[in-house]
């Protein structure tokens, strides 16, 4: 009767599944390994004080979360795989029912306290202490996930076609090179589980082991994150609007001077470019070491628009000149009225002036003189006077002599002489009045011709500056944006 309970317990143990026995074996193994009498997680796992513990590191990139250009911080989600050997955690698997792998909480074993040295938020260690994987030969593998914010020096020279080299520097916080040795398990970071970024392309992720020649006890492992920006976002939202706004400045030279809106268009374009320049200053870091590429382009276009404002003032000044204020020099006529229009593909419409529109003043003077000389040579009838002068005053043919003679034949001689004298005097005064009007019209024609010449000079200057602006704008844009597109960035070499 006394052996019955013991027999029942033995039968119950035999009927249990194998995993329960295995769980009991793992529990017993953990109790044996982590017994406080034989294991202290604060002591380095070395058989002697001079023994060097080798820590093998391997970084696996999960996600490039963001790169804050203004604060110069890179945020990444990584897994930092660490491997080392702890002889105190080795066991004979045959004594524990073939258990070869044991998972132990990380805080219960010795850790090499490897931290991110160049962190930017004060978080040096990992955020989650996952279990370590311990094998029967004493090798330990720890793969903790972490979200790191690391300091990254942003090079703004080619923004937004830039390529950055941000680093993650890992080092033990309390142990130096005489106690632990950090080595790379692979020359580059692992990207098997990487989630692509919408803003950056990963160019390369080389790792290097750095030893300070001045301090042999210093050693660290550094991973270079060589990333290249995807410029589509900034091209659509910054570069193309800037180019379109700059192209509006070209219309300033094509706009007629008489419309009065040339200066308004120039100032509007300049204000728009100033707004974009202020927008850029909110994105890039406030550094004085270099000027971003988009900033250089905006400054370049602002200089061009300022130049267009100056040229517009000059063109308007030339356009509104007149003979009463300025005299056109001969070289100006030769250069801007004859030579430059040919090279600028400009053709001035010809001025068609009808010769019968108004008699020339010299002809009127000649007619008056002839009329006076005729009266001085001898008495003449009004018919002779008509025949000599009416052709110039009135296009209607003069009255024939026979009609005039028959009209005056019945008058006395003295009356005829007095009548012809008064008629000659009235006719002379009329001719002098017509001569004055002709001279005035001729003077107005000359002044108007000079004014039209000044306006054409202004058009030539406007067209000249138009070609200069277009050529400089195209060459400047290509010179600024083409080199960064074809530039090859070499990754940093380790020491």
UniProtKB/Swiss-Prot annotation:
Residue(s) at site: Key residue for a low dissociation (K(off)) from the conotoxin BuIA: 133, 141
Topological category with respect to the lipid bilayer: Multi-pass membrane protein
Tissue spec: Predominantly expressed by immature T-cells in the thymus.
MF terms (GO), sorted A to Z: acetylcholine receptor activity; acetylcholine-gated monoatomic cation-selective channel activity; transmitter-gated monoatomic ion channel activity involved in regulation of postsynaptic membrane potential
Catalyzed reactions: K(+)(in) = K(+)(out); Na(+)(in) = Na(+)(out); Ca(2+)(in) = Ca(2+)(out)
Summary of activators and inhibitors of this protein: Activated by a myriad of ligands such as acetylcholine, cytisine, nicotine, choline and epibatidine. The heteropentamer CHRNA3:CHRNB4 activity is blocked by the alpha-conotoxin ImI and AuIB.
UniProt cross-references to Pfam families, sorted A to Z: Neur_chan_LBD, Neur_chan_memb
Binding site for Na(+): 261
Segments crossing the lipid bilayer: 236-256, 265-285, 298-318, 464-484
Entries under InterPro entries matching the protein: Neur_chan_lig-bd (IPR006202), Neur_chan_lig-bd_sf (IPR036734), Neur_channel (IPR006201), Neuro-gated_channel_TM_sf (IPR036719), Neuro_actylchol_rec (IPR038050), Neurotrans-gated_channel_TM (IPR006029), Neurotransmitter_ion_chnl_CS (IPR018000), Nicotinic_acetylcholine_rcpt (IPR002394)
One Gene Ontology CC term in the entry: postsynaptic specialization membrane
Disulphide bridges, residue numbers: 152-166
Protein name: Neuronal acetylcholine receptor subunit beta-4
Organism for this UniProt entry: Mus musculus
